[in-house]
């Protein structure tokens, strides 16, 4: 019950903190497709303005994740810019939903998380930046064969051309399984990737 109330409070705070400007920071005007690779994982991610799903002043994302063990995770999120001036730092918060088909039979998971995404521009001329996110789904909002979900990532980004960027970083992505099943680590390693804006 406490977890549920805490999550609802966070959602209210998130809703009251979003920016009201017409052109908030870090909301892409067009579309972006990212391809992320590590030794054991592949992820394809699509980013666009939330207008595509009928929500103004937001950013929508959808992703397909595949591990070497043939774990498949689909996710979708909607984040909103925080209404504070942090200079070179942009902060977005919002929910993200995960649907996982794990390689073990009958080990499927659905989770509704809340998190934050940050991006800090190190060099404005080069648009060199560090970025990261943190999402957590508590037991009360995690269904199926897991009790909770944790998804953390940090990366360095650098533009390669007007429409393309390169990035590299580290991701920690795991479920705590039910009935003493331990921890299911989907990713715990370095990755590299490319992003294309159009």
Predicted regions and their residues:
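N-terminal signal peptide c-region/cleavage motif recognized by signal peptidases
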Residues: 14-16
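Short glycine/proline- and aromatic-enriched beta-strand/turn motifs that initiate or cap beta-hairpins
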Residues: 18-75
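Short, surface-exposed loop and linker segments with low hydrophobicity and enrichment for Pro/Ser/Thr
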Residues: 20-28, 81-86, 90
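Extended hydrophobic secondary-structure segments that form protein cores and membrane-embedded regions
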Residues: 61-63, 92-97
């Amino acid at each position: 019950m406490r977890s549920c109330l805490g999550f609802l409070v966070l959602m209210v705070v998130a809703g009251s903190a979003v920016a009201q400007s017409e052109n908030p920071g870090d909301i892409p005007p067009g579309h972006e497709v990212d391809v992320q690779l590590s030794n054991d994982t592949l992820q394809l991610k699509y980013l666009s303005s939330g207008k595509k799903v009928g929500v103004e002043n937001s950013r929508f994302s959808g992703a397909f994740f595949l591990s070497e063990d043939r774990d498949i995770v689909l996710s979708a999120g909607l984040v909103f810019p925080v209404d504070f001036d942090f200079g070179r730092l942009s902060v977005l918060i919002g929910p993200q939903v995960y649907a996982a088909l794990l390689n073990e039979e009958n080990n499927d998971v659905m989770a509704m998380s809340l998190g934050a995404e940050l991006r800090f521009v190190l060099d404005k001329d080069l648009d060199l930046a560090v970025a990261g996110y943190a999402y957590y789904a508590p037991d009360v909002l995690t269904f199926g064969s897991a009790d909770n979900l944790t998804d953390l990532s940090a990366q360095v980004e650098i533009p390669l051309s007007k429409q393309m960027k390169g990035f590299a970083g580290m991701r920690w992505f795991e479920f705590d399984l039910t009935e003493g099943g331990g921890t299911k680590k989907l990713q715990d390693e370095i990755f590299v990737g490319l992003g294309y804006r159009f």
